[in-house]
From Swiss-Prot:
One of its GO terms (biological process) is L-leucine biosynthetic process. HAMAP family: LeuC_type1. InterPro entries: 3-IsopropMal_deHydase_lsu, Acnase/IPM_dHydase_lsu_aba_1/3, Acoase/IPM_deHydtase_lsu_aba, Aconitase_4Fe-4S_BS, Aconitase_4Fe-4S_dom, IPM_dehydratase_rel_enz, IPMI_cat. It comes from Geobacillus kaustophilus (strain HTA426). Heterodimer of LeuC and LeuD. GO terms for molecular function: 3-isopropylmalate dehydratase activity; 4 iron, 4 sulfur cluster binding; metal ion binding. Pathway: Amino-acid biosynthesis; L-leucine biosynthesis; L-leucine from 3-methyl-2-oxobutanoate: step 2/4. [4Fe-4S] cluster binds at residues 347, 407, 410. This is 3-isopropylmalate dehydratase large subunit. Catalyzes the isomerization between 2-isopropylmalate and 3-isopropylmalate, via the formation of 2-isopropylmaleate.
Length: 471
């Protein structure tokens, strides 16, 4: 039998209908829903007199527009209406909802895995581009638009052209202070935001295998920033250990049977990819973005580049525009860039291990004068556990603001806005113009890099710092 990739296996397992020259009709195993991209979809069902085909394969929460200081005081009318609409729609159509009173509420891409909804071999969709996060479990997960949200609600299927396959192999071990966030930023920085266009990426190699599930989620989360339709990692013992005992994961003998099926999903030895990229893990350093897309990045010991370093006029002009927006001069050492804001959170880096890592840098220190620092847990479960471990108190003692769960300052859609012209060291995934607020200047970094920037008031090389034990 011809060796297959995990991408091929999952895709073929879910084709409901195929016609040459047309998209395949795929069955969807899990549909995650939030308040921003779903109201029009539900209204479409209502107008057409349709029901949700599989409420049991649908799960909803609110995250994008949720205030993180007091979640029950929603002053923005649009946000208030969207949240109320989600509650109303879930009641009407019988969809499970983790609402603002629920201990299970959080960012949709954080709670899916922690509840055990996300499982290997599943097709998973959500009206959010960072649905690729769930690929860390060996699932085929991708974002969809509002019209597609309606289609999945009504039919539990989706029309999709099959992308090509791209293997990115990270060989060897990562050095001290280098994290999963640095790996994905380095990939995008070296190969560009279009490297994955037209592909689904499978991440492989020793460095990936040595990562925890939460680190793998960071990698897959930002595969969309590399232009890919999705990103995933073949499941292994780390995957199975994470899922065991989760609320919606199989139990007892059923779990053992599931593990047998999940093991068979891994890409076969000798499977062919349309393209392969290999990277030596030891060449990756802590990364910082200096521009207005995730590829505009360099190592923390680097400098802001000159436009003339880039080959094409188009690239040179893009760099000039980015530097003007960011208020940076070519040749400036990255460690000389001051920050006025620090945001530790988002679906990329708001899990318990992220907060532990950040707290290990912060413990016993104080936030630098003139810096406002936020820590926003990715879910209420993460918040509860972080408080139980004493992590929250470490942040509070250092001068950080400790918040409720939500998307927060990742995007300029809720009260957590970065002011115009100010620099923010952010653990989120996008640094486009205005992403964190009009005129906000975003630098994407890992949780430890963000924590260090909060303490020192500028970027520092975390490889030169000593972390404190926190648990």
């Amino acid at each position: 039998m011809k060796p297959k990739t995990i991408i091929d296996k999952i895709w073929e397992n879910h084709v409901v209908y195929r016609e040459e020259g047309k998209p395949d009709l795929l069955y969807i195993d899990l549909h995650l829903v939030h308040e921003v991209t779903s109201p029009q979809a539900f209204e479409g069902l209502r107008q057409k007199g349709r029901k949700v085909r599989r409420p049991d394969l649908t799960f909803a929460t609110m995250d994008h527009n949720v205030p993180t200081v007091n979640r029950f005081v929603i002053t923005d009318e649009v946000a208030r209406n969207q949240i109320a609409a989600l509650e109303r729609n879930c009641r009407e159509f019988g969809i499970p909802l983790a609402d603002l009173h629920s201990e299970e509420q959080g960012i949709v891409h954080v709670i899916g895995p922690e509840l055990g909804l996300t499982q290997p071999g599943k097709t998973i969709v959500c009206g959010d581009s960072h649905t690729s996060t769930h690929g860390a479990f060996g699932a085929l997960a991708f974002g969809i638009g509002t019209s597609e949200v309606e289609h999945v609600l009504a039919t539990q299927t989706l029309w999709q052209h099959k992308p090509k396959t791209l293997q990115i192999c990270i060989n060897g071990r990562l050095g001290k202070g280098v994290t999963a966030k640095d790996v994905i930023l380095a990939i995008i920085g070296r190969y560009g935001v279009g490297v994955g266009t037209g592909y689904i990426i499978e991440f492989t190699g020793e460095a990936i295998r040595r990562m925890s599930m939460e680190e793998r989620m960071t990698i897959c989360n930002m595969s969309i920033e590399a232009g890919a339709r999705a990103g995933l990692i073949s499941p292994d013992e780390t995957t199975f250990a994470y899922l065991r005992g989760r609320k919606y994961a199989p139990k007892g003998e059923e779990f053992d049977k599931a593990v047998e099926r999940w093991r068979a999903l891994a890409s076969d030895e000798g499977a062919k990819y349309d393209k392969t990229i290999e990277i030596d893990a030891s060449t990756i350093a802590p990364m910082v973005t200096w521009g207005t897309n995730p590829a505009m990045s360099t190592s923390v010991d680097g400098v802001v580049p000159h436009p003339e370093q880039f080959e094409s006029k188009t690239e040179q002009n893009a760099v000039r525009r980015a530097l003007e927006y960011m208020g940076l001069k070519p040749g400036t050492p990255i460690t000389d860039i001051p920050v006025q804001h620090v945001f530790i959170g988002s679906c990329t880096n708001s899990r318990l291990s992220d907060l532990r890592a950040a707290a290990s840098i912060v413990k016993g220190k104080k936030v630098a004068p003139g810096v406002r620092a936020l820590v926003v847990p990715g879910s209420q479960q993460v918040k509860k556990q972080a408080e139980a471990e004493g992590l929250a108190q470490i942040f509070i003692d250092a001068g950080f603001e400790w918040r409720d769960s939500g998307c927060s300052a990742c995007l300029g859609m809720n009260p957590d806005i970065i002011p115009e012209g100010e620099h923010c060291a952010s653990t989120s995934n996008r640094n486009f113009e205005g992403r964190q607020g009009k005129g906000a200047r975003t630098h994407l970094v890992s949780p430890v890099m963000a924590a260090a920037a909060a303490i020192y008031g500028h970027f520092v090389d975390v490889r030169q710092l000593e972390a404190e034990p926190v648990c």
